[in-house]
Amino acid sequence: MIWTRLPLYGPSKPSTGGWQPLRFDGGAFHVKGTAELARALLVLRLCAWPPLVTHGLAFQAWSQRLLGSRLSGALLRASIYGQFVAGETAEEVRNCVGQLQALGLQPLLAVPTEEEPDSTAKTSEVWYEENLSAMLRCVDLSRALVDAHGPARNSLMQLKVTALASTRLCKELSAWIQRPRGSSELSPERLAEAMDSGRNLQLSCLSTEQNQHLQASLSRLHRVAQHARAKCVRLLVDAEYTFINPALSLLVAALAVRWNSPEEGGPWVWNTYQAYLKDTHQRLEQDAEAAHKAGLAFGVKLVRGAYLDKERSMTQLQGKEDCTQPDYEATSRSYSRCLELMLRCVSNHGPPCHLMVASHNEESVRQATKRMWELGIPLDGPVCFGQLLGMCDHVSLALGQAGYMVYKSIPYGCLEEVIPYLIRRAQENRSVLQGARREQALLSQELWRRLLGRTA
C-alpha cells in the first residue's frame, strides 16, 4: 500500500440529514440570463452535429468567402467564440472572470497554442520563444485575476508542453525512454539539474541540433515554472497523445523535482492523467508512491481523456496493441478507481497532495463529493473540480453554489488563433459534445419555463 500514516482528515461526522447529493437538474440556471441560455443551447446543438465538427475549418473558410471576414467574424463572436472563449484582451478576460467569480467559479486560463501532433514541418525557435512570452503573460494575468477576486492559493493555469518543445523532440525522447536502458540517461534529476544550472545536456539518443533544442526547451519550461512560483500560480500540465506522453511525464517529473517541495507550498506543477488509457491507474499509483518517497508534493488533474478516436486510428495504422479502454463503461470504471486512489491520498497526506476532478460526468462528480464527505476532506481543501468554459454549467454552478472549488478552463486570444484551436478541441471531444444531450434538455426546459412565465 502507498499510504501508511494515519489520515490527516478524519471521517466526517454526519450532519443531521446525512450526506445530501447535489442536484444537477438545471436549477442553478436561474443565475444565467436568457440570452446566455439561448446561445448555449444553439451552440451545443451545433457542436453535436458531426459534419460541423469534422469539417469545421472548411466551414470557417467557406463562411469567410461567402460573408466576408468581418461578418463571418461577427457571427463567430456571437456564437462559438462567445460561448467558449473569454475574449481577446486582458480587459475582456477580466470581465468574463468577474462574471464567473460572482457565480462561485474560478478561472483556469489556457493559452490556445500547440504544435500539431502529426506535423512533420520543422518549427523555428522563434515560434517557441513567442509562446514562452505568451505563457509568462498568462501567469501574470492569472495572478492579477486572483488578486482581484480571491486568495492567491487558488490561482491555477494550464500549460501545453508542445507549445514550448517540439513534438518531434518529444517523440524521440519517448522512444528512447521506452528502450531497456534508455531511462538511465534520462532521469528527472538530471534534467532538473540542467534546468537549474543552464548547462548543456548531450544525450546520445539525440543529434547536436536536437540537443540544442532540448536545452532551449528545458530553459523555457524552467522560466515558466520559475515565474509561476514567484507569482504563486500553479501549473497544470496538459496530457497529449500517448506517443509523446513518456517524454511529457519525464519533463513534468523534472519540474516536480525542482518545484514541488512541500516546504515551498508545492505542488506548483501538476500532471494530467487520462483514465481512458489501460495503464493509468498503475502509473498513478507508482507516481504517487514515488513522490511520497522523494518527499515531494503531488498534484493531479484527472480526466477521462480527449484523444480516443485518434489514438485508436493511429494504433491500427501502426499495427500496435490498443492501449485504450474498450468502451465508455470501462473508462468510467478506470476513472472511478483513480478518483478513489487520489481521494485516499489526499485524506492520508493532506495539502501536499492536490487533485482536480476534471469531469463533465455527473456520477463521477457525485462520487467525488460523497467520498470527500466520508473522508472528511474540507470543501476548501486540496480537492477541486474542473469543467470547460461554456459547457456543463448545470454541474459547475451547482458545485460552486454548494461551496466547492470549481474551475472553468478558459482559452483566450484573437479569433484567428482561437477558432482552429476550438475546432481541434471539438474534434477531440466528440463524445463529450454529442453526449451533452442532458445539458441541452435542461437548457431547453429552463428557456421554456421563462417563455411561459412559470415559477422555478
From Swiss-Prot:
Cofactors that this protein relies on: FAD
UniProtKB keywords: Acetylation, FAD, Flavoprotein, Oxidoreductase, Proline metabolism
Molecular functions (GO terms): oxidoreductase activity, acting on the CH-NH group of donors; proline dehydrogenase activity
Catalytic activity entry: trans-4-hydroxy-L-proline + a quinone = (3R,5S)-1-pyrroline-3-hydroxy-5-carboxylate + a quinol + H(+); L-proline + a quinone = (S)-1-pyrroline-5-carboxylate + a quinol + H(+)
InterPro entries listed in its UniProt record: FAD-linked_oxidoreductase-like, Proline_DH_dom, Proline_oxidase
Spans through the membrane: none
Assigned protein family: Belongs to the proline oxidase family.
Any one of the GO CC terms: mitochondrion
Induction: In liver, by TCF1 and HNF4A.
Keyword Flavoprotein: yes
EC number(s) stated in the UniProt entry for this protein: 1.5.5.3, 1.5.5.2
Organism of this sequence: Mus musculus (Mouse)
N6-acetyllysine carried by residues: 310, 320
Biological role: Dehydrogenase that converts trans-4-L-hydroxyproline to delta-1-pyrroline-3-hydroxy-5-carboxylate (Hyp) using ubiquinone-10 as the terminal electron acceptor. Can also use proline as a substrate but with a very much lower efficiency. Does not react with other diastereomers of Hyp: trans-4-D-hydroxyproline and cis-4-L-hydroxyproline. Ubiquininone analogs such as menadione, duroquinone and ubiquinone-1 react more efficiently than oxygen as the terminal electron acceptor during catalysis.
Pfam short name (any one): Pro_dh
GO biological processes: proline catabolic process
Protein name: Hydroxyproline dehydrogenase
UniProt enzyme class: oxidoreductase
